[in-house]
Swiss-Prot record:
Disulfide cross-links: none
The protein's role, per its UniProt record: Catalyzes the reversible conversion of 2-phosphoglycerate (2-PG) into phosphoenolpyruvate (PEP). It is essential for the degradation of carbohydrates via glycolysis.
Name of the protein in its database record: Enolase
Name of the top EC class for this enzyme: lyase
Pfam family, one: Enolase_C
PROSITE patterns to which the protein is assigned, alphabetical: ENOLASE
Co-factor(s): Mg(2+)
Residues given in the record as (2R)-2-phosphoglycerate binding sites: Q163, K339, R368, S369, K390
Annotated gene: eno
Binding site for Mg(2+): D242, E287, D314
Entry's family note: Belongs to the enolase family.
GO CC terms in record: cell surface; extracellular region; phosphopyruvate hydratase complex
Catalytic activity as recorded in UniProt: (2R)-2-phosphoglycerate = phosphoenolpyruvate + H2O
Length: 427
């Protein structure tokens, strides 16, 4: 019996020591699913609303007791007796119960925790791995990891404007080999930075956060580490960037406030990226190269470099089918970043990914900077055959647990496991 008999929500802590929400869903046959919700530091304006208590006397206003209360009250009552295998019905019931366009009444964090926990409970009831339950017999593609090795922007207190510099070991023959390659680059980068006298303290996502002199020094340090680790930039290990441009878009200008204070118009920002793509041919992907509502700038960027590299919309699309449809119709970007907590239910996440695939857009399943020990997104990446995952560096257990889950899945799939390599970026 996959009937829901009990739902329980609680407040726990994320990887930054901030409160977040966890939910347990119990079924009539004794099966149980548990899921915890991540939280972002650089959040898009159009994301579903994360409910916080606002009590400054407790966790500096970031408590999640009200979200947990909603789970234990309204949500538990509404879902009692429903079939956990009917994910669309479960998620639809919570959306209707909330009654707002952005899940702001009950909280997207409350709704998502229950949504994911329900899927886990249903998978447990069927004695099926989560990736297989969600994706069926065709779920066999392991993702190329985007490993964040230098942090800047809102993720680190340093002089780097661009938020993430990542390596993607696409030249590997398997996920486990790709992970090894990325880890070796990460450890080599530590030596490169130490030799130059830089700190090797890490940021929120486990990448290093040194006080580099410029954004150029950051990417060049990554390239140096790739080479010193014995790999070839652009041939078997690529560079992926997440500038998180909305974070430095002020008054209609892109302002590099952390480094040289330079300002750029949208046209100049596009030219900046075009120059980087020419100068650094190892660049495979740029995420949020333009601000979330700079649609004209995004269109120009897509027309300028979209045929050469992957252009990922994160704050632009916020895993939202409505915004993604607008982008597809306008010829903007060619890839979507998938963050389950941006939209707030598993059903809507899967709908956005399907829409992207139908339009020939790639998809990158992603963590948030405030993570938990829940490896749900590892299973999601395999379930959807996304081919790419972005889940931090080779440090911090909140990041490593996703990689370890992917290793387990690859082992379980055996000879049927597929590693897409460079094909992951094909459209």
């Amino acid at each position: 019996m996959t009937t829901i008999v009990r739902i329980f929500g609680r407040e726990i802590l994320d990887s930054r020591g901030n409160p977040t929400v966890e939910a347990d869903v119990y079924l009539a046959d004794g099966s149980m699913g548990r899921a915890a919700v991540p939280s972002g530091a650089s959040t898009g304006e159009h994301e579903a609303v994360e409910l916080r208590d606002g009590d400054k006397g407790r966790y500096l206003g970031k408590g999640c007791l009200n979200a947990a209360k909603h789970i234990n009250g309204e949500i538990a009552t509404a879902l009692h007796g429903k079939d956990a295998t009917q994910q669309g019905e479960i998620d639809g019931a919570m959306i209707a119960l909330d009654g707002t366009p952005n899940k702001g009444r009950l909280g997207a964090n409350a709704i998502l925790a229950v949504s994911m926990a329900t899927a886990r409970a249903a998978a447990a009831a069927q004695r099926t791995p989560l990736y297989r339950y969600l994706g069926g017999v065709g779920a066999n593609t392991l993702p190329v990891p985007m490993m964040n090795i230098i942090n800047g922007g809102a993720h680190a207190d340093n002089s780097v404007d661009l938020q993430e510099f990542m390596v993607a070991p696409f030249g590997a023959k398997s996920f486990s080999e790709a992970l090894r390659m990325g880890v070796e680059v990460f450890h080599t980068l530590k030596k490169v930075l130490s030799k130059k006298g830089y700190s090797t303290a890490v940021g929120d996502e486990g990448g290093f956060a040194p006080m580099l002199k410029s954004n150029e020094e950051a990417i060049e340090s990554c390239l140096e580490a790739i080479t010193q680790a014995g790999f070839k930039p652009g041939e078997n290990v690529g560079i992926c960037l997440d500038p998180a441009s909305s974070e430095f878009f002020k008054g209609g200008k892109y302002v590099f406030k952390k480094s040289d204070k330079s300002e750029r118009t949208s046209e100049q920002m596009v030219e900046f990226w075009a120059n980087w793509v020419r100068q650094y041919p190892a660049i495979l992907s740029i995420e949020d190269g333009m601000a979330e509502d700079d649609w004209a700038g995004w269109k120009l960027l897509t027309d300028t470099v979209g045929s050469k590299i992957q252009l990922v919309g994160d704050d632009l699309f916020v895993t939202n089918s409505t915004r993604l449809k607008q982008g597809i119709e306008g010829g903007v970007a060619n890839s979507i970043l998938v963050k389950v907590n941006q939209i707030g239910t598993l059903t809507e996440t899967l709908e956005a990914m399907q829409m992207a695939a139908n339009a020939g857009y790639t998809a990158v399943v992603s963590h948030r900077s405030g993570e938990t020990e829940d490896p749900f997104i590892a299973d999601l990446a395999v379930a959807t055959n996304a081919g790419q995952i972005k889940t931090g560096s080779a440090s911090r257990t909140d990041r490593i647990c996703k990689y370890n889950q992917l290793l387990r899945i690859e082992e379980r799939l055996g000879s049927s496991a597929v590693f897409p390599g460079r094909k992951a970026y094909s459209r």
